[in-house]
UniProtKB/Swiss-Prot annotation:
Names of the cofactor(s): a divalent metal cation
UniProt xrefs under Gene3D superfamilies: Nucleoside Triphosphate Pyrophosphohydrolase (3.90.79.10)
Known EC number: 3.6.1.-
Identification of the protein by name: RNA pyrophosphohydrolase
Record's function text: Accelerates the degradation of transcripts by removing pyrophosphate from the 5'-end of triphosphorylated RNA, leading to a more labile monophosphorylated state that can stimulate subsequent ribonuclease cleavage.
PROSITE patterns in alphabetical order: NUDIX
Gene Ontology process terms (BP): nucleoside phosphate metabolic process; ribose phosphate metabolic process
MF (Gene Ontology): bis(5'-adenosyl)-pentaphosphatase activity; guanosine-3',5'-bis(diphosphate) 3'-diphosphatase activity
Family: Belongs to the Nudix hydrolase family. RppH subfamily.
Keywords assigned by UniProt, alphabetized: Hydrolase
Keyword Membrane: no
Stored CDD domains: NUDIX_Ap4A_hydrolase_plant_like (cd03671)
UniProt-listed Pfam families: NUDIX
Organism: Bradyrhizobium sp. (strain BTAi1 / ATCC BAA-1182)
Length: 168
């Protein structure tokens, strides 16, 4: 059995989708192994990078698969890959015990569509499994308090890097 410390990180992307008012999209997760309490169930879209896929293409794909959104303009990306470890108590259940956490490339995207484009209940016209049960626009500076605690340092860095793009 592989020791927790020796497990690799899952390569992923994260998306800060910013609307014309400078607010950021967050989705309410339906629960699962990361669930801590009802105050920490909100997150920005994120997901894995497929083999042979570059991070930018993965970001657009994941955003569509989770929200149905295609109307975006790329504003920025964080140069570094940001990492977080999942708690040891759930490491064996998350991703079938193959990873200790995620290494994420983060993108800031301007949402150029209308709210009617967003569909978290039947993303991609129902082709993709719903990851969120609801969504809202939120001031960027609030995001670290809404995420599960073990992802908080990543969200703090994302806010620091992208705050000016949201006008805050």
């Amino acid at each position: 059995m592989t020791r927790y410390e020796d497990l690799p990180y899952r390569t992923c992307v994260g998306i800060a989708l910013i609307n014309s008012e400078g607010l950021v999209f967050i989705g309410r997760r339906a629960g699962g192994i990361e669930h801590v309490d009802d105050a920490h169930v909100w997150q920005m879209p994120q997901g894995g990078v497929d083999p042979g896929e570059d991070a930018w293409e993965a970001a657009k794909r994941e955003l569509y698969e989770e929200t149905s959104v295609r109307s975006v303009e790329k504003l920025a990306e964080i140069d570094d890959w940001l990492t977080y470890d999942i708690p040891r108590t759930v490491a064996g259940r998350a991703w079938k015990g193959r990873y200790r956490g995620q290494r994420q490339k983060w993108f800031a995207l301007r949402f150029t569509g209308t709210d009617t484009e967003i569909d978290v209940e039947r993303p991609g016209g129902g082709v993709h499994k719903a990851e969120f049960i609801s969504w809202r626009w939120e001031p960027m500076q609030n995001l670290p308090t809404l995420i599960v605690p073990f992802k908080r340092p990543v969200y703090e860095r994302v806010v620091k890097e992208f705050a000016a793009l949201a006008g805050k």
